[in-house]
């Protein structure tokens, strides 16, 4: 009769009876009276909040069905990863596998104990701690001993790669605690009419959770074998749901459906920048990002004093001082300080030019080359000389121009010691000593030291006169000839004599004028 009565009850009532009054589950009349009272709306708890607290404590002391005890914890964690060997199998293991087995088993057991699992010490752990051989007695049964041993060795190796972490075990304990509190709270909700008691219980549960997390963080703070300080941070976030019921009485439930959906309330914690709202998965990445906003540069080069916001940037910079070039081209052996420079260099071998100008379809191997090229279409010259106001498309052209004002000539010829303000000028000059003429005309075979000279020469074969005067229509093959012609119209005389101050339109005219002064000086001496 009692069992049949339990079957006819609603699921919630049947579960509550088995949990709350196991003795009454076998009694007919008392059971039916209690259940009838509960569903007619009478309060099963006529005591005050202290009675409810006492009942909660008694429920916590009971072994709730479906929740792991110390024994089940051992079965679900340690015994699942434990591997048993017979005496024969243990003897066949290589010393390296025996040592690996000892390390894995002892580490997993230590992690279980450190996060608070209450379990008796397995015999295999005692044997390993004493230095004894941890083999078990022979087990009768079918199977190939050699294949069984092979699978055990593979299990040891895979387990060594993924030993049970303290944080993972702690999350399991927290889930069990949440499920237990969930059942306790659900029971109180069903049998109590005191809403304020329920709310206080909910606050107590959340306070217990917060305290458990703080305790866990303190527990796992330790010093590893390398002397580094390790703090394991829990990434489990507990969500609190508020369900509204149709009844006039307000009911707030602290519900975690971890039994049916164990991962639905677990999400990875993220870190958001409160300035630009960018999100990061690791706190160290957020810290590095914040230096963009603060301008902080804590990493300083000891050689030159230059500061950087990231340690990686400092390491890359230091290669300038050490001369280290770790990235080497497999094609030609050329080495680079940066991987990006090597990637750009590879395009010289592959011929790849992924950056294309939208206006003229000219392609470039580097993005910076495309940016500089686009300024020829837009006319932009963003780099201005502070001395004379002249503007340039590229910063290197401005740097070279500034040397005109400073008189700096940092490039010296090793053959004749002549100095130059531009590296290109030195390169061109050195061809005088070497006799190199790398630019050859395909039409007549004539060779030139500079590319501009070859370009000017080609107009002899093509007959093209690309430079035409807007005032008189006269055309010229060379840009230099065109500029000289324009001085006829403008009256410009940039070449001035240092002795008499007379100015000339052409440099050749100034040279002829200097001859007059030299002849006059010679006559005066005679």
From Swiss-Prot:
Organism of derivation: Homo sapiens
GO cellular component terms, A-Z: nucleus
Tissue spec: Expressed in visceral and subcutaneous adipose tissue.
CDD domains per record: KRAB_A-box
GO molecular function annotation: DNA-binding transcription factor activity, RNA polymerase II-specific; RNA polymerase II transcription regulatory region sequence-specific DNA binding; zinc ion binding
Domain SCAN box: 1-39
Stated family: Belongs to the krueppel C2H2-type zinc-finger protein family.
ZnF C2H2-type span: 271-293, 299-321, 327-349, 355-377, 383-405, 411-433, 439-461, 467-489, 495-517
Function: Putative transcription factor that appears to regulate lipid metabolism.
PROSITE patterns: KRAB, ZINC_FINGER_C2H2_1, ZINC_FINGER_C2H2_2
SMART domains: KRAB (SM00349), ZnF_C2H2 (SM00355)
SUPFAM superfamilies per the UniProt record, alphabetical: beta-beta-alpha zinc fingers, KRAB domain (Kruppel-associated box)
Keyword NADP among UniProt keywords: no
GO BP term, example: regulation of lipid metabolic process
Higher taxonomy: Eukaryota, Metazoa, Chordata, Craniata, Vertebrata
Induction of synthesis: Up-regulated in both visceral and subcutaneous adipose tissue of diabetic individuals.
KRAB domain span: 76-147
Entry keywords, A to Z: DNA-binding, Lipid metabolism, Metal-binding, Nucleus, Repeat, Transcription, Transcription regulation, Zinc, Zinc-finger
Protein name: Zinc finger protein 69 homolog
Subcellular location per the Swiss-Prot or TrEMBL entry: Nucleus
Coiled-coil stretches noted in the UniProt entry, renumbered to this chain: none
